[in-house]
Regions:
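Short, basic/aromatic beta-hairpin or loop at an interaction surface
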Residues: 76-83, 140-152
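Compositionally biased, proline/threonine/alanine/serine-rich low-complexity intrinsically disordered stretches
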Residues: 1-39
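Surface-exposed, glycine-biased beta-strand/turn segments
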Residues: 29-137, 169
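A residue-level detector for short acidic-glycine micro-motifs
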Residues: 90, 112, 153-156, 174
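Short histidine-centered loop motifs in beta-beta connectors
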Residues: 96-99, 103-104, 143-170
């Protein structure tokens, strides 16, 4: 579940180490197949139990500009320099306090878990704590072909998986 905080809406990133496969017509003309250069990429599902554009939103996209500038998937600026994930946010604090389930975006194996950090705004955490662990309570999953996803800023005590555990798409993580 996403953290309870009285400071600000949560950013709930599912930080991908590489961009997900774009939907594009295939050689056969069929829509929604991965482009050939990303054919081995897993198909990522939404990692939150919410409805995009209704009660959750993209806060930041993956930065596709290889240099010092920024460019999201649509050549826009909804990212920041060097960002390697897709950050999702909830509608408001009451929704966050009720809890929204964070789920695996694709099948894989849990490779890292951190739980126990307090549920506070990242702006309320000491700078040293942020430097050591900017993701707060988190789960990282390894997927096929070297892809990884990270689910950060989870509610303290909510993590339901352990290192080494296999997971399936849609399985609750925290």
């Amino acid at each position: 579940q996403v953290p309870a905080t009285a400071q600000e809406p949560a950013q709930v990133p599912a930080q991908e180490r590489a961009p997900s496969a774009p939907s594009a017509p295939s050689a056969s003309g069929a829509p929604n197949e991965p482009s050939p250069e990303l054919a081995g990429a897993p198909r990522f599902a939404l990692p939150l139990d919410c409805t995009p554009g209704d009660d959750c939103f993209v806060q930041n996209h993956f930065d596709r500009d290889p240099g010092p500038g920024t460019r999201d998937y649509a050549c826009g600026a909804l990212t920041y320099d060097g960002h390697t994930g897709t950050d999702l946010r909830l509608l408001d604090l009451p929704q966050m306090e009720r809890g929204v389930e964070v789920v695996a975006a694709a099948p894989g194996r849990v490779v890292a878990v951190h739980d126990g950090d307090p549920d506070v705004s990242m702006h309320a955490r000491p700078r040293e704590a942020l430097a050591r662990n900017p993701s707060g309570n988190a789960v990282r999953i390894a997927h096929a072909d070297g892809w990884e996803t990270q689910y950060s800023h989870l509610r303290r005590g909510s993590v339901r998986v352990r290192v080494g555990q296999p997971v399936v798409t849609g399985q609750p993580l925290g």
